[in-house]
Amino acid sequence: MRLVLVGPPGAGKGTQAEFVAAHLAVPKISTGDIFRSNVSQGTPLGVQAKRYMDAGELVPDEVTINMVRDRLAEPDAGEGFLLDGFPRTTPQAAALDKLLVDLGTALDLVLELVVDDDEVIRRLSGRRTCRGCGKVWHVEFDAPSQEGRCDRCGAELFQRDDDKPETIATRLREYADKTAPLVDYYGAQSKLVGIDATGPVEDVTVRAIDALRSYSG
């Protein structure tokens, strides 16, 4: 199965991508992993991407799409894959459709993790990161035994700028402007399936697997 996972920040895409890819026995492919691999190996695309990243600029779609093309052409993706973090915009989605045609295949399904904004803010704003070991705690879901201190190393916990409500609100607006239109794009292709991504991680995984079974069956 060839699958794309979409959803707002804080929806749990990374976690669910791992479980769903393992269930399908296909590689989980994230743009972050692709970028790191190309940059560390010094590929021509990696060199281009690093130039933009070092300048604090966004990597152009053309570079990103070519990296994705190269990754999807590898043997382990021949029988299927799960894309996490790509596409993020409708132009990227159209480019993905085209490159899959060039590879002689097509996307099967787009799984949307549905979470409302209030839940996203609750999840992300509750994160606290250890200044010592980097472990991430949560004031509600995974609180340390001593408030403000890491159980693992005893160092101070702090709230990253990315986890502050005002930053989260900005990220949600960007998602609504750029990524949410993917729902309409893939809905028009009858490839979109949405699941409730609230509740325990295990419950969300069960819903995701059930949705895939319904599609396959």
Curated annotation (Swiss-Prot):
Pathway, per record: Purine metabolism; AMP biosynthesis via salvage pathway; AMP from ADP: step 1/1
CDD domains: ADK (cd01428)
Region called NMP, residue ranges: 30-59
Keywords: ATP-binding, Cytoplasm, Kinase, Metal-binding, Nucleotide biosynthesis, Nucleotide-binding, Transferase, Zinc
EC identifiers of the protein: 2.7.4.3
UniProt: AMP binding residues: T31, R36, E57, L58, V59, G85, F86, P87, R88, Q92, R160, R171
Location of this chain's protein in the cell: Cytoplasm
GO biological process: AMP salvage
Reactions accelerated catalytically: AMP + ATP = 2 ADP
Region (LID), start-end ranges: 126-163
Sequence positions that bind ATP: G10, A11, G12, K13, G14, T15, R127, G199
Domain of life: Bacteria
Binding positions (Zn(2+)): C130, C133, C150, C153
Enzyme class: transferase
One term of GO molecular function: ATP binding
Gene Ontology CC: cytoplasm
Task performed by this protein: Catalyzes the reversible transfer of the terminal phosphate group between ATP and AMP. Plays an important role in cellular energy homeostasis and in adenine nucleotide metabolism.
NCBIfam families assigned to the protein according to its UniProt record, in alphabetical order: adk (TIGR01351), PRK00279.1-2 (NF001380), PRK00279.1-3 (NF001381), PRK14527.1 (NF011100)
Notes concerning its domains: Consists of three domains, a large central CORE domain and two small peripheral domains, NMPbind and LID, which undergo movements during catalysis. The LID domain closes over the site of phosphoryl transfer upon ATP binding. Assembling and dissambling the active center during each catalytic cycle provides an effective means to prevent ATP hydrolysis. Some bacteria have evolved a zinc-coordinating structure that stabilizes the LID domain.
Similarity-based family: Belongs to the adenylate kinase family.
Subunit structure: Monomer.
Protein name in UniProt: Adenylate kinase
Taxonomic source organism: Salinispora tropica (strain ATCC BAA-916 / DSM 44818 / JCM 13857 / NBRC 105044 / CNB-440)
